[in-house]
A protein has these predicted regions:
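A short, charge-rich alpha-helical start-of-domain segment used by transcription regulators
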Residues: 1-18, 28-31, 42
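Sigma70-family region 2
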Residues: 26, 38-54, 68-77, 136, ...
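Solvent-exposed, charged amphipathic helical/linker segments at domain boundaries
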Residues: 156-162, 167-255
Length: 318
């Protein structure tokens, strides 16, 4: 394969990552799927006859890769998808394996910075944690149909050609997928991280968290805020329980420092806990959901693995 064709493949990496992420629910698996797609495309380049666009050909390969990866796998979810809320004094159950959970993805890996603003808002909506979790309720082929038709705006005939099926089958799968998603509760989130009011809220949140002023922090939370900490299945509902947790089992977060990033179309922060005098180490990637000027979701993804994926430093020094 020529260098030129290789560069043509790379042009599509970001959008393929977004597609595979929606299909798989894991940023790590999405990266693996895209890499496998590129390898297969590279090896099969001589057989690409050009009857379809390079983009369509790549999506066919990526879809097959994702379907292969999903064969026999369990449905990924958020803690609130698996059971009722707990209270702050609940004893933590053991953490569940990584393949239990939806994992966050950095916006830059899936969203084109030069996209049309209206299109960018729509794409943010379709990488929200709640939406990606809802997609996992669909059988894999239905999932592919819905993403290609509803998110990427492909024609039914294009999807039928990709999946080697009929237009009627595509339309039927789309109807079933829509019906399933209508039964899944989707949280509402204000997806305008650059909005001045939202920026002010985030500044106040970081200030309260770093000072560990829990009264101030709780005042920023929505009455129906949800708080979770994958890999633990426990989740909390309401400002009171979140505040109790922060002052109780979560008190080890006192003295943390925060670095801003973005994930799943939302504001996010790398939280670094004190490790030794003058040194802070990765603890949690926090993804914040906001609605009506208050924080409605606090998703704390524990562990250092995501920090490297998000380009965050391995430690902070005073």
């Amino acid at each position: 394969m020529s260098t030129t064709v290789g560069l043509d493949l790379e042009v599509h990496r970001r959008e393929l990552t977004g597609y595979c992420y929606r299909m798989l629910g894991s940023s790590f698996e999405a990266e693996d799927a895209v890499q496998e797609t590129m390898v297969r495309a590279w090896r099969a380049a001589d057989s690409f006859e050009g009857r379809s666009a390079l983009k369509s050909w790549l999506y066919r390969i990526a879809t097959n890769v994702c379907l292969d990866m999903l064969r026999g796998s369990q449905r990924r979810a958020r803690p609130m998808d698996l059971g009722p809320s707990s209270t702050a004094d609940t004893v933590l159950a053991p953490g569940l394996p990584e393949n239990t959970w939806i994992t966050p993805v950095q916006d830059d890996r899936v969203l084109a910075p030069d996209a049309d603003p209206a299109e960018l808002t729509e794409y943010r909506e379709t990488i929200r944690l709640a939406f990606v979790a809802a997609l996992q309720h669909l059988p894999p082929r239905q999932r592919a149909v819905l993403i290609l038709r509803e998110v990427l705006r492909w024609q039914a005939s294009e999807v039928a050609e990709l999946l080697e099926t009929s237009v009627g089958s595509v339309n039927s799968a789309l109807q079933r997928a829509r019906a399933t998603l209508e039964e899944v509760e989707l949280d509402t989130t204000d997806l305008s991280p650059a909005d001045p009011k939202q920026q002010e809220l985030l500044t106040r949140y970081v200030d309260a968290f770093e000072r560990y002023d829990i009264d101030s922090l709780v005042s920023l939370l929505h009455d129906e805020v949800k708080f979770c900490m994958p890999p633990y299945p426990m989740w909390l509902s309401g400002p009171l329980e979140v505040g109790r947790w922060m002052l109780g089992p979560g008190a080890g977060c006192r003295g943390s420092r925060m670095l801003a990033t973005s994930a799943n179309g939302c504001a996010a922060f790398g939280q670094y806990r004190p490790a030794s005098p003058g040194v802070h180490e990765p603890w949690s990637l926090q993804v914040l959901e906001i609605s009506d000027g208050r924080i409605t979701g606090l998703h704390n993804f524990l562990g250092p693995e995501l920090f490297e994926a998000f380009g965050l430093p391995a430690r902070l020094f005073d």
